[in-house]
From Swiss-Prot:
This is Deoxyuridine 5'-triphosphate nucleotidohydrolase. Pathway: Pyrimidine metabolism; dUMP biosynthesis; dUMP from dCTP (dUTP route): step 2/2. Pfam families: dUTPase. One of its GO terms (biological process) is dUTP catabolic process. Its EC number is 3.6.1.23. The gene is dut. The lineage of its organism: Bacteria, Pseudomonadati, Pseudomonadota, Gammaproteobacteria, Candidatus Palibaumannia. InterPro entries: dUTPase, dUTPase-like, dUTPase-like_sf, dUTPase_trimeric. The keyword Metal-binding applies.
Length: 150
């Protein structure tokens, strides 16, 4: 199994803030927590960049990190400001999470609250070749629902 070294920037993690971990043996993502001193109120329509206290350098060009929302926050209208985050293998820095309140109510983020998840995925890079045409397929150029609904 591939291991990735995650650096902890904030010395309070493991003491005041819980150390990130997989919740179950079958968990694909690791919860990221708000590493903040005080509550943050997100007004409807507002975004805020929240520190996780973590930094990462994946350093393997075959891997990337994907930051995705937690379904429990989506229930309250809280989503990621950029909807999904991508951490390239050569990025070396802090993991920050942009939260956006799409709801109609003020939402309060508590210190140590789980605010997003990170999933590590394998990456395949593609090569582009200029061609005159493709080999014909049954589907052809039909898109936007042409493969059927059922």
């Amino acid at each position: 199994m591939k291991k990735i070294d995650i650096k902890i920037l904030d010395s309070r993690i493991g003491d005041c803030f819980k150390l990130p971990k997989y919740a179950t043996p079958g968990s694909a993502g690791i919860d990221l927590r708000a590493c903040i001193d005080n509550t943050i109120s997100l007004e409807p329509g507002e975004t805020n960049l929240i520190s996780t206290g973590l930094a990462v350098h994946i350093a393997d060009t075959g891997l990337a990190g994907i930051i995705i929302p937690r379904s429990g926050l989506g229930h309250h209208g809280i989503v990621l400001g950029n909807l999904v985050g991508l951490i390239d293998s050569d990025y070396q820095g802090s993991i920050m999470v942009s939260l956006w309140n799409r709801g109609k109510e003020i939402f309060t983020i508590q210190p140590n609250e789980r605010i997003a998840q990170i999933v590590f995925v394998q990456i395949v890079q593609v090569y582009f070749n200029i061609v005159d045409n493709f080999q014909k397929s049954k589907r052809g150029e039909r898109g936007f629902g042409h493969s059927g609904r059922v």
